[in-house]
UniProtKB/Swiss-Prot annotation:
GO terms for biological process: dendrite extension; positive regulation of dendritic spine development. Its main location: nucleus. This is Protein LLP homolog. Belongs to the learning-associated protein family. Residues 1-23, 91-114 are annotated as: Disordered. GO terms for cellular component: chromosome; nucleolus. Regulates dendritic and spine growth and synaptic transmission. Residues 1-21, 91-108 have a biased composition (Basic residues). InterPro entries: LLPH-like. Transmembrane segments: none annotated.
Length: 114
């Protein structure tokens, strides 16, 4: 879809605003780091526990992917006839229509073929 003049203008104005406000934003971020860096880190330590790298990797290995389900690669249906959860409804509807279209083709009786 083509970009409208309005969207181009808005993008241009946002870029100029970013340029104008960049020094103020930088100073604000630096002041946050200067004043409360130690205080913020203490709060984070209270909330979160720091784990060694080995333990973190071991915990990640426990996760299982959903590979137990047998899925048809062509139709993306699993053994229960369900589509994957990430597929949106329009895509499901389209695939279902294609599947049913193939089933509806009626065969001509043997005697009537000219």
């Amino acid at each position: 879809m083509a970009k409208s003049l309005r969207s181009k203008w808005k993008r241009k104005m946002r870029a100029e605003k970013r340029k104008k406000n960049a020094p103020k934003e930088l100073e604000r971020l630096k002041s946050i780091l200067r004043t409360g860096a130690d205080v913020v880190m203490e709060e984070v330590k209270e909330v979160a526990t720091v784990l060694p790298a080995k333990e973190a990797l071991e915990k990640q290995d426990d996760c299982k992917m959903d590979v137990d389900n047998k899925r048809n690669k062509k139709t993306l249906l699993d053994q229960h006839g369900q589509y994957p959860i990430w597929m949106n409804s329009r895509q499901r509807k389209k695939l279902k229509a294609q599947r049913l279209k193939g089933k509806k083709k009626s065969k001509l009786p043997k005697g009537l073929a000219w």
